[in-house]
Regions:
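Active-site-adjacent structural elements that line small-molecule/cofactor binding pockets in enzymes
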Residues: 1-264
C-alpha cells in the first residue's frame, strides 16, 4: 500500500462562480494539493446550492486551466449516466488533462433518500435495494473495462479511448462495496466520521492485498480543518494507523482562499 499521506481538496461547485472555481483551482495547484475533486449532482438543492454545474463538463474546463494537479469526481454516481456515456465523458476529461483524471465512482442513494430527489425529478429510476445498486456499479465497471480495453470490440473502435487508464476509486459505506473496491478498482473512499470506518477500510485493504495490489489508494473525506493539513497531527496519525494514505478535505460554502493557501 502507498505510505505517503496525500492531501486533496473538494469543492461544492454549486456554491461557487466560475471565477471563484478558477481561483481555487490555481491556489490548490500552487499549494501542493494532489487532487481537486468536484461533486456529481444534478440539482443544487441536495447540496444547499442555488444550482449545480454538471460534473464532467466542469472537469473538462478545470483540466484546461490547470497543468499539474489531478482532477476528479467524488464520486460519479453511476445512476446519473449510461455507463457508456460515463466512459466517454471520463475518457474525454482524461485526454484533455493529459492523464490527470482520478475517477471516483459511487453506487448512488436509495430512492427514499433525500439525495434521490434530483433523479426522481428527472424520472430516472433508481434501484430499490442496496444489492441492486451495487450490481449496477459493477456493471459500470464491466462496461468501462470493455470500452477501454486495448482489444475492444470493433463496434467501439471510434469511441474515445483514454490516453491512459484513470485510477478508479469507489466511495463506500458498507463491507460489501469495500470488497468490490479492493477486488476490482484502484482505491476506496469513505466518510471520515463513518462509525465503521476502520473495519470497512480494513476489508478493502485486505481484499486489495489478496488481489496483489501494492499501490491501493485508501482515502477518507472530511470537512476542511487546518489541523488535517499537518501529517504529524493526532488526527492524521490515527488515520495513517488505519492505512489511510489520502485525506480529501471539503470546505463548506465558497472555499476561503486564505485558508487554502498554506504551503506544506
Amino acid at each position: 500500500m502507498i505510505n505517503e499521506l496525500g492531501i486533496d481538496l473538494q469543492v461544492n461547485q454549486g456554491q461557487c462562480s466560475w471565477a471563484q472555481l478558477t481561483e481555487i483551482a490555481h491556489i490548490a495547484e500552487n499549494n501542493n494539493y494532489q487532487t481537486l475533486w468536484v461533486a456529481d449532482h444534478l440539482s443544487g438543492q441536495v447540496m444547499n446550492a442555488p444550482s449545480m454545474p454538471e460534473c464532467f463538463t466542469l472537469l473538462g474546463a478545470l483540466a484546461a486551466i490547470t497543468s499539474t494537479i489531478n482532477i476528479g469526481p467524488l464520486v460519479a454516481n453511476v445512476g446519473n449516466r449510461h455507463p457508456g456515456v460515463l466512459a466517454s465523458a471520463a475518457a474525454t476529461v482524461q485526454n484533455i488533462s493529459g492523464g490527470r483524471l482520478k475517477l471516483g465512482l459511487g453506487a448512488g442513494a436509495s430512492p427514499t433518500s433525500t439525495f434521490a430527489a434530483e433523479q426522481l425529478a428527472l424520472g430516472i429510476a433508481l434501484p430499490a435495494t442496496m444489492s441492486e445498486r451495487h450490481a449496477k456499479l459493477e456493471h459500470t465497471l464491466d462496461v468501462l473495462d470493455e470500452i477501454w480495453s486495448p482489444t475492444r470490440d470493433e463496434k467501439f473502435a471510434t469511441f474515445e479511448m483514454p490516453c491512459k487508464l484513470p485510477p478508479r476509486i469507489i466511495g463506500v459505506n458498507s463491507m460489501a462495496l469495500a470488497k468490490v473496491a479492493g477486488a476490482r478498482t484502484d482505491g476506496v473512499n469513505i466518510r471520515s466520521s463513518h462509525p465503521q470506518r476502520a473495519e470497512i477500510l480494513r476489508v478493502a485493504q485486505d481484499t486489495a492485498t489478496a488481489a496483489g495490489k501494492s499501490d491501493f489508494i485508501v482515502s477518507v473525506w472530511d470537512w476542511f480543518d487546518e489541523a488535517l493539513l499537518d501529517p504529524t497531527s493526532a488526527g492524521c496519525k490515527e488515520l495513517a494507523s488505519e492505512g489511510v494514505n489520502k485525506i480529501i478535505l471539503l470546505m463548506r460554502g465558497v472555499p476561503d482562499a486564505k485558508r487554502l493557501a498554506i504551503k506544506r
